[in-house]
Amino acid sequence: MGQRFLTLYSKFFQKFLKSKKPPRLAGQWSRLARPLKVVFDCSNGVAGLVLKQLKTGEIKTYFINEKPDGNFPAHGPNPLNPGATNQLQAAVKKNKADLGIIFDADADRMFCIDDKSRFINPDAIARILAWQLKPKKIIIDVSTGWLVKKLQVTSYKLQVIESKVGHYFIKKMMRAENADFGAEQSGHYYFKNFFGLDSGILAAIEVINAVSELPYKLSDFIELLPKYYHQEINIRYQESGIRNQEIFKKIEKKYLLLNTKYLIRISHLDGLTMEFENKIGPASRSLGEGWWFNLRFSQTESLLRLNIETTEKSKFQKEVSKLKKFLQLAAR
């Protein structure tokens, strides 16, 4: 990466760093609402080249794996791989940091660790960014959970629009809807003021801006959020016998026979999505209480991806077991 381009690219991001200094002195983190300690794990990718050029002022920054290395000796380029965040979590704990941020190799994705060294679900990061950015429209994919989906019926005056999973579809929807912000479960965050594209570095900057303005620690913010149980489960074709879209029709038919009374919605936007209310009456419907699942084929791997979310842990385990059983039967 040429130094001139790197400098220009870094200057572009610099303007997003909030400052309460006079305009002629702006462009540092030193006058955020409160000082922070932040640990960056650059995964031996490109993030460190940009972040180290930013003026951080009184914000204490720590870098690990910041040197680009195509062999990715630390933990590989994917932050979601098992053990990939171990170094970052240890560094947050050791330095008593307020926040840890890890990037993938090209820094278009980022994930966060809170001040208690806990991994933060991307849905919660999207919620933080929505609180910080105050967008009027958010684009999400079908695997995004209630923490973001329910923003439009809780305390935020905004519109949440669902898209198919994937860069192409999110970017297309960002332009078509003139949306301010977009989020995917995969750790991609999209910004209108970044040409409608995804940027892990800009997402990191805005998370830092948000955390500095919280009246309490990041971990407190996370603990105050509504509690949902949400997970993506990957099922390989050869393990299940799944081969075509007929699987969705069979699953849909099975649930319609069992739960029609409690069905809230069905969507075929990307695979199959079905949402149900709990069996406690219609009052739960307005709050989105109950559970939902989405089944879709991966665009990049021979996998069927199952996303499921419930309001109770016991319900989560029960519905996962039931869905897996139905999948085995439907694949025959």
Task: Give each language-model segment a name.
Residues 1-21, 32-95:
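Gly/Ser/Thr-enriched, mixed-charge loops and adjacent short helices
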Residues 25-26, 280-289:
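Glycine-biased, low-complexity coil/linker segments
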Residues 43-48, 107-108, 144-146, 312:
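Gly/Ser/Thr-rich loops at beta-strand to alpha-helix junctions
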Residues 51, 88, 129-133, 204-211:
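Buried hydrophobic packing segments
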Residues 135-151, 158-279, 290-332:
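Phosphate-binding and adjacent anionic-ligand microenvironments
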